Amino acid sequence: MNMLSNISQVEFPFEEISEVKRKLKEKEQKRIVLSQRDFDVLNFILEMKFASVDEVYRKFFKTIDSQGKEMGFHYAKKRLVQLAGSDFLKSTKAFSESKRLFFATRRALSALREIYPGHEFARPSGSIDSRTIVHDYLLLKLRLVLEEKGEVVHWLSDRTIKVQTGILSHLGEAYSPDAVITHRDGSKTALEFEIAVKAKSRYQEKIKRYVAWIREHRQDPSAFTRVHYVVMSPTTQRHLEHFSGIYSDLFKIELADGYLGEYGGVKC
């Protein structure tokens, strides 16, 4: 009997064949060609910690047909699932299991760094922090509202601020704003979003630090020149208005209802 005959008679266990097929399938799933929109989505999710299909659809996929019907939600959901299947994203259920949130992985960060060498990106969170999830999700909603109103043309998140140098002098990482936003006219504003009432001393200290920072950087055209507080509680609004006092021209303090009400209220 020749060697070919011997080989043809070799039997492979069914379990081994199944395992090979499974690995081949997984390898095939990881083969994905990233588009510019994919990179934008990954960076957006890195910046904001996480996002659901709703937010990704609204920012990147939403289109209106000739009858005025919104389209694109199915494609947004499908693409997020594909990105998760290729290990660029992970997901988890949140808010009583009613919503799936996607967050970026190290593979997403590596892909972004490869396309944009030298650019500082936020680090992957690795998970979703239950202590800040409500604040983070409402901040995500607030960002979309401000962008859709045309009030914001660029958003620099606190997560990105913390990996860049120079912005936190006099403020300190613990007092970093939630974002630095750029307006149509090129001016910049530090954005603070408050969902809970904090100690008066913290508001007083933060106002003091902001005033010092703005004064120190008044000759820097790239620096923010005002601070915009969006708050959930009238009590917080009163405290901030009190401590901003004579510096009120540097601060804009508003209740969140005027913004988040346009995004289906403040519910998650």
Positions of the model-derived regions?
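Active-site metal-binding core of divalent-cation-utilizing nuclease and nuclease-like domains
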Residues: 92, 131, 144-189, 198-202
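Amphipathic alpha-helical dimerization/coiled-coil segments
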Residues: 114-156
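Nuclease-adjacent, charged terminal/linker segments that flank catalytic cores
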Residues: 1-126
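Short, solvent-exposed loop/turn segments at secondary-structure junctions
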Residues: 48-51, 96, 109, 160-162, ...
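Soluble or luminal CAZymes and related metallo-dependent hydrolases
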Residues: 75, 134-138, 202-205, 209
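Charged, structured surface patches that assemble and position nucleic-acid processing machinery
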Residues: 246-268
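Catalytic cores of nucleic-acid endonucleases
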Residues: 195-246
